Amino acid sequence: MTTQLTHLQQLEAESIHIIREVVAEFDNPVMLYSIGKDSAVMLHLARKAFYPAPPPFPLLHVDTTWKFRDMIEFRGRMAKESGMELLVHVNEEGVKRGVSPFTHGSALYTDVMKTEGLKQALDRYKFDAAFGGARRDEEKSRAKERIFSFRSANHRWDPKNQRPELWSLYNTRIKPGESIRVFPLSNWTELDIWQYIHLEEIPIVPLYYAAVRPVVERDGMLIMVDDDRLELKPGEKVEHKSVRFRTLGCYPLTGAVESEADTLPEIIQEMLLTRTSERQGRLIDHDQAGSMEKKKQEGYF
């Protein structure tokens, strides 16, 4: 008797196959852990792929020093629970220069603290493959990227030089110094992610659930006041609203949405009615036309 897999089971099986393929083919893989919902699902899949042993690779978090406090607390808890080594890398040169989203703008800040920080970490530990939680439905440049995304020795991505991926066969050959970025969640949608989190009871950062939080309206977005480093501009005032986050990043660059959805079923119901991208709340995606693709070509994930 043939068992018919559900949609989520098919996605799960594909992702686990990809994760195992990387471990079989590469010498020194790593999983980028950004602490968001996609990272939570990816970590869960990795643990399933190698259960009862822990995944045979470490977690890497590129810390910009501007993450939400709830994210940092959650990061430590999940690393301990998974039994995996957690590597945290900070671009100390950027810290010494005082680079921040307020003083240097989102584009330069992202380049220094995220892109350069990531490249430093990959070079330092000599990783030849790095898992990421990006999905094709998030953004147009990610929509055309392969699951196994080739990067040069300078960590650059050339969208015109991508490898064919037919019948779940992946070309993993690289020269010394080159690497591959791997996206096991490429074919998942935001709704798939939420339904899987609900089905598997995967822990996520509390910021995804609606709650009354201090926010300030800035450039058409609701920015949460997470610590005293957020300086108010003339005319701005802190308000307390029921909000949640569809996507998580650095708190000064991540907009909240007004919502009353404080349970997973309510979030899923809200998702069914939403017609905008989750990354609409990420300021770094609006720096310039083709912003994300330019960042990826320079080494961003």
UniProtKB/Swiss-Prot annotation:
InterPro entries: PAPS_reduct_dom, Rossmann-like_a/b/a_fold, SO4_adenylTrfase_ssu, Sulfate_adenylyltrnsfr_sub2. Pathway: Sulfur metabolism; hydrogen sulfide biosynthesis; sulfite from sulfate: step 1/3. The keyword Metal-binding does not apply. Pfam families: PAPS_reduct. Keywords: ATP-binding, Nucleotide-binding, Nucleotidyltransferase, Transferase. Belongs to the PAPS reductase family. CysD subfamily. Heterodimer composed of CysD, the smaller subunit, and CysN. This is Sulfate adenylyltransferase subunit 2.
